[in-house]
């Protein structure tokens, strides 16, 4: 039985101050970032907007140390999707800001970030304390194709759909974890650990099967 401890971290949306709190209290864990680590929400009042590269750099360092895995979310994918577009054609303000920050880097550093993001997984499965965990940002499909990739990143019926529809697409064995949907939701073997609409960051610890919201 694998007794490695995992800390599943829901959508951060640029709140590096909250991430620092989580890391300080979870030092002995391996981290699974559930996507949407960047792009500050306009309704956030508890935290200030910070450079997306500060967030990505911190997570990238943990990944290179084999202490973390980043699951690609729709907000990380926005970087790849809009990379070659003229600035005036990019609708999301935060995406324009992120791409502007990337363009200020040296070519080698920029390519290093892009290679890391393009090779980050869309789904991640692991075993901890006798349980199988299957993680994705919005929809679990380990056999995704270019045609179904968008569902994995944004869910079925983007941006919102009834949770019971999501339950129809998971198997009875294993524990399924998602971010993306704004509110925490726990039922049977389906768990959504996103707390964005509470201005918090949802975190789940596999060793003690505990869900917490950090602010």
Where would I find each of the regions flagged by the language model?
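Beta-strand-turn-beta hairpins that frame and shape the catalytic cleft
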Residues: 1-7, 126-134, 188-189
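N-terminal active-site segment of His-dependent metallophosphoesterases
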Residues: 1-54
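A general structural motif
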Residues: 3-4, 26-30, 65-67, 131, ...
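Active-site neighborhood of phospho(di)ester-bond hydrolases with catalytic His/Asp-centered motifs
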Residues: 9-10, 31-35, 69-74, 135-136, ...
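Active-site environment of divalent metal-dependent phosphoester hydrolases
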Residues: 13-18, 39-42, 75-81, 141-143, ...
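Active-site neighborhood of divalent metal-dependent phosphoester bond hydrolases
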Residues: 40-126, 130-131, 158
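Active-site-proximal segments of metal-dependent phosphoesterases and phosphodiesterases across multiple
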Residues: 140-170
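Conserved beta-sheet core of the metallophosphoesterase superfamily
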Residues: 158-215
């Amino acid at each position: 039985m694998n007794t490695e401890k995992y800390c599943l971290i829901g959508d951060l949306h640029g709140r590096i101050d909250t991430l620092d709190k989580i890391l300080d209290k979870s030092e002995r864990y391996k981290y699974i970032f559930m996507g949407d680590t960047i792009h500050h929400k306009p309704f956030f009042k508890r935290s200030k907007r910070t450079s997306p590269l500060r967030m990505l750099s911190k997570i990238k360092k943990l990944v290179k140390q084999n202490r973390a895995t980043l699951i690609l979310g729709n907000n990380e994918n926005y970087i790849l999707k809009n990379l070659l577009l003229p600035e005036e054609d990019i609708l999301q303000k935060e995406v324009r800001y992120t791409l502007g920050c990337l363009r200020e880097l040296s070519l080698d550093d920029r390519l290093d970030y892009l290679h890391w993001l393009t090779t980050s997984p869309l789904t991640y499965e692991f075993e901890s304390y006798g349980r199988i965990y299957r993680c994705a940002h919005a929809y679990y499909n380990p056999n995704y194709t270019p045609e179904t990739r968008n569902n994995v990143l944004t869910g079925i019926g983007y941006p919102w759909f009834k949770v019971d529809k999501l339950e129809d697409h998971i198997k009875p064995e294993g524990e399924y974890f998602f971010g993306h949907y704004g509110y925490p939701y726990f039922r049977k073997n389906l768990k959504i650990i996103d707390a964005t609409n509470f201005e918090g960051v949802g975190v789940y610890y596999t060793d003690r099967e505990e869900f917490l919201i950090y602010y």
